[in-house]
Amino acid sequence: MYKNLLFTLLIMAGMQFLSSCAGCSDSGKKSQGDALTLPDSLISDAPLRLSEEIMNEVIGNISSPVEMAGLFKNSGVDFTQRILNNPDNVSRYETSYQRALNLGVYSADLGYINTFDKNNIVVSYLLAVKNLADGIRVGQFFDFNALRRMASSSTNLDSLMEMSQTSFNKMDSYLREQNRSNVSSLIVTGAWVEGMYIASNIVRESGDKELSDRIAEQKNVVNILEIILSNYASDAGFAELVQSVEDLKAAYAPVRITTELGEPQRIEKDGSLIFIQAEVSTVHYSPEDLENIMATIENIRAKIVN
């Protein structure tokens, strides 16, 4: 589920740099999460321009916060619908910008709902997703009638989420193939913000250390989001969103992530034995740092859903 990422970004006139993963564990355990690391020389106030091809690769490599759903349940905190975006809010979202952002929000909510097997409210969230997808002309990727039938039985929830995820993947691929990566980037951002918002609420209630680390390690993802969104700063709504991400980047500034080489791992691939260099990563932050990050995330989320 959590995989190490190593990919090359070509920026400006063919400049190359590597973005590698950094996990999160103050105890020095092997990385369990994805974090995309930028060299300090490329993290500046000036926006970097990415080609459409590279934008597609970056967006595709940012892990959806839906993948954090297992940590939500492991925290021991009971399911709370009040922290999710109310499906009735769909009528508020009248622009493509709002619809794309909140399509991401509801996708993260669905992951949280599925984790706790709350099939009694799944349909209303699927309907919200369908309405927003129709609003940005990608509703053809969601067979709502089939999804609704599957949602009527708790025994079908795994298949339901698999089908939903397949629909989202097809939709994302279509958007990027149609040179609508600006829309795809909004969906990714909305999903990421909602996942961090849910995680923040759970941390406030439980103090869960693993989730706290997961929030803190997202510093590198924020750097990537800033680059992605800055490419569309001239589009309606994006300038304000970029400013919000810059505020979040400032909140993450005190967080440090250090990485050391661990023992190589042996795996078999295509009949051959290969070695993969493991990494041991540690995230360093104070309770005050975490509180400031969570407060900033909550502020951004409020702007998106209201």
Regions found by a protein language model. Name each.
Residues 1-8:
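Bacterial N-terminal signal peptides that target proteins for export
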Residues 17-23:
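C-terminal motif of bacterial Sec signal peptides marking the signal peptidase cleavage site
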Residues 24-30:
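N-terminal intrinsically disordered, low-complexity, charge-rich
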Residues 31-149:
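N-terminal Sec/ER secretory leader and immediately downstream segment
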Residues 88-91, 95-98, 110-117, 121, ...:
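Non-transmembrane, amphipathic alpha-helical segments
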Residues 103-106, 110, 125, 129-132, ...:
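Amphipathic alpha-helices that form helix-helix packing interfaces
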Residues 156-242:
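Extended amphipathic alpha-helical interaction segments
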Residues 231, 235-306:
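A cross-kingdom marker for long, charged
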